[in-house]
Amino acid sequence: MTTYRAIPSDGVDLAASCGARVGDVLPGPHTGDYAPLGFWAQNGSMSQPLGESPATATATATATTRPSPTTPAMPKMGVRARVADWPPKREALREHSNPSPSQDTDGTKATKMAHSMRSIQNGQPPTSTPASSGSKAFHRLSRRRSKDVEFQDGWPRSPGRAFLPLRHRSSSEITLSECDAEDAGEPRGARHTGALPLFREYGSTSSIDVQGMPEQSFFDILNEFRSEQPDARGCQALTELLRADPGPHLMGGGGGAKGDSHNGQPAKDSLLPLQPTKEKEKARKKPARGLGGGDTVDSSIFRKLRSSKPEGEAGRSPGEADEGRSPPEASRPWVCQKSFAHFDVQSMLFDLNEAAANRVSVSQRRNTTTGASAASAASAMASLTASRAHSLGGLDPAFTSTEDLNCKENLEQDLGDDNSNDLLLSCPHFRNEIGGECERNVSFSRASVGSPSSGEGHLAEPALSAYRTNASISVLEVPKEQQRTQSRPRQYSIEHVDLGARYYQDYFVGKEHANYFGVDEKLGPVAVSIKREKLEDHKEHGPQYQYRIIFRTRELITLRGSILEDATPTATKHGTGRGLPLKDALEYVIPELNIHCLRLALNTPKVTEQLLKLDEQGLCRKHKVGILYCKAGQSSEEEMYNNEEAGPAFEEFLSLIGEKVCLKGFTKYAAQLDVKTDSTGTHSLYTMYQDYEIMFHVSTLLPYTPNNRQQLLRKRHIGNDIVTIIFQEPGALPFTPKNIRSHFQHVFIIVRVHNPCTDNVCYSMAVTRSKDAPPFGPPIPSGTTFRKSDVFRDFLLAKVINAENAAHKSDKFHTMATRTRQEYLKDLAENCVSNTPIDSTGKFNLISLTSKKKEKTKARAGAEQHSAGAIAWRVVAQDYAQGVEIDCILGISNEFVVLLDLRTKEVVFNCYCGDVIGWTPDSSTLKIFYGRGDHIFLQATEGSVEDIREIVQRLKVMTSGWETVDMTLRRNGLGQLGFHVKYDGTVAEVEDYGFAWQAGLRQGSRLVEICKVAVVTLTHDQMIDLLRTSVTVKVVIIPPFEDGTPRRGWPETYDMNTSEPKTEQESITPGGRPPYRSNAPWQWSGPASHNSLPASKWATPTTPGHAQSLSRPLKQTPIVPFRESQPLHSKRPVSFPETPYTVSPAGADRVPPYRQPSGSFSTPGSATYVRYKPSPERYTAAPHPLLSLDPHFSHDGTSSGDSSSGGLTSQESTMERQKPEPLWHVPAQARLSAIAGSSGNKHPSRQDAAGKDSPNRHSKGEPQYSSHSSSNTLSSNASSSHSDDRWFDPLDPLEPEQDPLSKGGSSDSGIDTTLYTSSPSCMSLAKAPRPAKPHKPPGSMGLCGGGREAAGRSHHADRRREVSPAPAVAGQSKGYRPKLYSSGSSTPTGLAGGSRDPPRQPSDMGSRVGYPAQVYKTASAETPRPSQLAQPSPFQLSASVPKSFFSKQPVRNKHPTGWKRTEEPPPRPLPFSDPKKQVDTNTKNVFGQPRLRASLRDLRSPRKNYKSTIEDDLKKLIIMDNLGPEQERDTGQSPQKGLQRTLSDESLCSGRREPSFASPAGLEPGLPSDVLFTSTCAFPSSTLPARRQHQHPHPPVGPGATPAAGSGFPEKKSTISASELSLADGRDRPLRRLDPGLMPLPDTAAGLEWSSLVNAAKAYEVQRAVSLFSLNDPALSPDIPPAHSPVHSHLSLERGPPTPRTTPTMSEEPPLDLTGKVYQLEVMLKQLHTDLQKEKQDKVVLQSEVASLRQNNQRLQEESQAASEQLRKFAEIFCREKKEL
């Protein structure tokens, strides 16, 4: 009978507690205090108020130290009675106040967890959750032992209400072995308010069968503990054992315990499955099982210890002892040596202490009611309980005392997960997945997506990803040839497969190795395989070797990995041919192993075969799956089995997922079907998926027995399948596993068909799995139906395979596998060993007995950092989705970074090492950023602070990331920050010498946090708004690579390289959709933004550049910028040939942001232009850095400029814009010379001189940031002015490779606008000599397009070398030339090609070095393929100077010197017949300003004709007199006016720079020159007054120009503003009149009527859009003089900016310029007229074609109808004949 004992009010000492008091229990790792006594229920089943831990009233663990006089105490019986009065134990307990494991109920554990934040790991509160491990454990305990019923307030109708009812009826019931971790993991019904009642077994059987062992054995155990620990601690350990929580996993019961319905994942006890009640019951009834009673008890106690370990290791008191180990050892999990590199994930979970504690538990495990049987049994019990509860007078069924008639199947109470829909109902012991669930992930972005249970997907259909799911991660050490291979098609991940099991097969079999077997006294039979292999020699440490080790125990978890010889302490010398003694390696890795028990295995095939079976027993590539057919109105098992024939909907489904095969003679996997006599049917369904064979047991294809309702022949097969598909026709009732009776069916996949047998047929899916099977993928999208397609088939088959793999991890199958493994090991240890010990030398080493033993030398520090396997650290990770901290293992291998939850033993995070972009280390914390800025947060465990340093070192070795930098950014007087940011958070351009630049921000940097807000959660617009509106802007950035390329995750990089725009988007952060939603920019229409059609046209010429840029091999080539995967660039290059590579990625990105102030994102067209311009600009910048970088920088600079999206070029171009005059003038030249001379001069001097001020130079210094040196000002609103700069960007096409991602994005930042805003000041600077300096750096960048050129960096360098003939000037011109080349080539290849030309042009360049535009021209000229480049270049120019670009860019910025020059209106691109003229025209904006893009155009069109004109323009622009004839020619060819700023910007700039510029005309020209230095060269100078070409080839333009002057630019010219220069250029190069970039303005002396000019301008604007297309059309050029042709091309390119911007500079220039400009206007008008006529003709042709197509379509339809009618008639005739026959 149950006895009651009064409990003192101050606390009750339970026998099991050993006198522990509630108050004595310390919080901490232990569970902490229990809930108030009033809430304690007998079995802890009673629901408890929030905040209180569930009472763990298990008899064993009942130290219900609740101070409640009203609560009855546990009865003192048997062992309990004797132990309870054990004073030492009581004292010990009180001292340590350690709650017994049993006490660690869910609630208590929850307290612990709260302490460690782990308890809530799964997001479930520890409070009275049914799954709480502690309570579960107790429930199991009570159930197994006494099955006593818990009563809420004591026994009904009994005074015992004031007493705590006893849980166990006899001492035997109290045995600790009964408290299984498994029990703990399962929620007990009592815990659930609505739970089913617990059942109690009456009679002696319950006490006798619980444990068939004498009590004496238990006392023996106690004595062992006492002998081991005579002090109070031993006592405490015992009490803890008695009270031990059945399972450590339970501790997280709320969080991830088995019963956790949230994750639906059972909490498993380490590797051992929790033992179901049934198992326990069996154990009771069959105690012997070949093990002595003592063994059984022993094992059960240790099992409990082991189970509690994982959960509350930290909280566990040192008193807990492991078998044979000191309590402290047992209390903590075993930690492997850090220098050991794990081969796979499960190896990281290997716990030697756990293996020792569980060594006896395997034999005790019993089969339990699992799978569908558990659900059906639960439903039967529920009905029985309900009826009995009713007879008990309304007592809560949870507390009724009823006898469980089927004691063997005493199931813990489980109510299911209340997750139902039309396909599936909630069911006890099962967990449902109905859509929207996603796998658990602790990363930051997951928190923003929602909790793990919230749908991640909502996709129309599941999408295949380059990333691996957490459950699919197995092998961590990946051979180089297999790392991140993207060539293989993406497929759904196969999950829960221990692929590491092939370690022995792949690395040992067939190679020299040694196997050792033995029986360890603590671990039982063990098997060790060890092998030494040579690695590549180390530069400093000589030969390198490593030891591969496999250590197998009874547990399924195996230790697999390797350790470097240098990382192993030994007394032997490292690196010798003989190697270290194997003993040293094993003792270091597994010090607890008794090495002396090992014996060498026999060298026979049997040993190898047995080891392979042992290791790979869990690997299977053959699966059998049942399919049940459920018709409308059906739901029961009998109904489904009795469906004799399949309906058409079912047949349709079967034909989709597999192939019907004839069984007779079938040779493949038959799944136990008869292939000889057809006894199991004649046909079956078979298929293969990812090398897995699947045979389906289809109910309608199996034999039907008319008189047998159970259809045993069918159920015999389907009932033994682990996974079953339930196919439901429309109208079928929801499925529930309660209707199925099978111990094996653990997973049901419900598929319902909609609109069967129609074209709109689709399927919906739901899954239900046994609660102890972990979740598996692929996740079902929320509210999604699948079309009938291969996508659905693959999804379903992957789900089926993963379902069976997951079910094998359930307790039932885990136990079976463990037993099998134990037998294998036992056989090997007993029958396959020799007598040779592992340390044979020790026997003869007698000297060691007397002489001093040689000390082992320490391992080389840090040697393991280069191991290929995963180095592991214990850390505490922040689970953002659940808001808790969890104990984890961090592993970093050569391929993966993974986090494993110690409690649930599952991977909770993984990413490729190539995906890591940076980290933020602190003294004890670490934030690791990956992908687009997502991150995980780690904290070192107590006393392991040095781990953070080791982790960072490992990240440096294995990843390409870098430490983050915190910056506080200031605003300028206009409120601008001075940089542009792309949609993916990378910085597109940085205003040179602006506050952001001074703070260290560089192009290519990646923003990961803005004002403490993670960028990964922001859209581009939100990013910009945050930057614009924050009072104090604090950012965390990840520096770019040395070449300026932004750091990106490898999938993002791969996507970009594929140049699929889609990929770009994939990499977009959750919030980071391309900022430019308008596709014009994204499409890379560039100028196409104003005219998408032209863009495509241009695309053809610019395609090469585009392709490269798109391919975005950033680092590898200038193309790199393109690599930014903006497939759009291809479009953009089309319109922007000159910026092909740069433009598309970098240019596009930048332009929109710059051009469009904050609105750049919103306006696609404008954005496109902006991007476009930025591209050239970037190119410019990049070339400049190239120079400054020298060979290295030339490459890096480009890469840097490009790589980041504008990289250096973008930076420089911006910078030039900012300091337009000097920058534009000098930089153009300087750049040219710098770029050109970068091979020779490398613009080192220029860098030094200008570099100081010039961001480019700086960028050189800091290659990472160099790309940012550009002058872009980030002010959010300044984007429009920057847009003009961006126009120069087109030269940066190389940069696009980086840009692809940022392309669209960069435009959005209002930064550019700011730049322009600051531009006025910059302009002034530009005017000053100093601009020259900046120019050089920017120039070099600008010239080559910097990053743009990156793709052709090497080419660029070559060009520079070629140009080197004119050392300073030539070098600069070269730089420009290369940039031009990039633009001209319109593809990185073009660039490369351009590089050949540049050599010729060097001389030209040298003469024209003064002109920034010249650089571009040079590119054109350089390319003897000028004609080929010339055509593209106009397009590019045009693209680079779209109207929007001009309008957006504030004139002031652009107007700086270079800008003013671009006054000449970009003529409509004339036929490229005259390459020089074309180039010239291109060089200048429509207004005649030199443009960077123009220079690109120049590349397309020969610049030779323009050389003189461009030269003049460049000279004037840069104010350098050094331009040589060659340079002049180059200048003419590639007018730098290509870069254009907004008219207003340019006008402002020009006004500032010079009076002439100030004039309205001057302002207009300024716009073109806004294009940046290059724009001056790029556009024909005809619009502008002739530049002072005369100038000395070397005079510097200004301070900045001085270095440039060295290059050959006249100092005097350095003063000239861009507009001025552009005017001058116009004189020098009449050819430039053709420039279509900006509308050229006539001189006042020209005698042109204003009205005529206005009309011309309007026409020009209109035509310009057309001309962009026509620019590509060389045919136009024939009509017009060569000069015109360039102009036209420029016009078309600049269509976006076509605003006729009168070039104020024109007035300044002699009438000649005006005349030239007038001529240019005439040419443009003529071109426009021609284009218009062509369009009209085309329209007529198209209309006629459309009419013809309509007629043909009508005719075809009629014919089709006639044919159908004939076929119908034939069919009728055929049918009639058939019937007649």
UniProtKB/Swiss-Prot annotation:
Compositional bias per record (Low complexity), positions renumbered to this chain: 54-73, 1196-1210, 1266-1281, 1599-1609
SMART domains: PDZ
Polar residues bias spans: 118-135, 1080-1111, 1157-1166, 1304-1322, 1425-1441, 1532-1547
The UniProt record lists the keyword Transmembrane helix: no
Modified residues (Phosphoserine): S100, S146, S401, S1364, S1544, S1547, S1619, S1622, S1677
Source domain of life: Eukaryota
Stretches of the chain forming a coiled coil according to its record: 1720-1774
Cellular compartments annotated: Apical cell membrane
Biased composition (Basic residues): 137-146
Record keyword Coiled coil present: yes
Domain PDZ: 966-1042
Keywords: Acetylation, Cataract, Cell membrane, Chromosomal rearrangement, Coiled coil, GTPase activation, Membrane, Phosphoprotein
Basic and acidic residues composition-biased segments: 87-97, 1245-1261, 1509-1518, 1625-1635
Region Disordered: start-end pairs: 45-166, 239-332, 1046-1112, 1124-1221, 1236-1565, 1583-1636, 1685-1712
One GO cellular component term: extracellular space
Residues with PTM N6-acetyllysine: K1448
GO BP, one annotated term: establishment of epithelial cell polarity
GO molecular function annotations of the record: GTPase activator activity
Modified residues (Phosphothreonine): T1387, T1699, T1703
Domain Rap-GAP: 611-828
Disease note: A chromosomal translocation involving SIPA1L3 is found in a patient with bilateral severe ocular abnormalities including congenital cataracts, corneal clouding, iridocorneal and lenticular adhesions and microphthalmia. Chromosomal translocation t(2;19)(q37.3;q13.1). In addition to translocation, missense variant has been found in patient with bilateral congenital cataracts. Cataract 45: An opacification of the crystalline lens of the eye that frequently results in visual impairment or blindness. Opacities vary in morphology, are often confined to a portion of the lens, and may be static or progressive. In general, the more posteriorly located and dense an opacity, the greater the impact on visual function.
Function, as annotated: Plays a critical role in epithelial cell morphogenesis, polarity, adhesion and cytoskeletal organization in the lens.
Protein name, as recorded: Signal-induced proliferation-associated 1-like protein 3
Organism: Homo sapiens
Gene: SIPA1L3
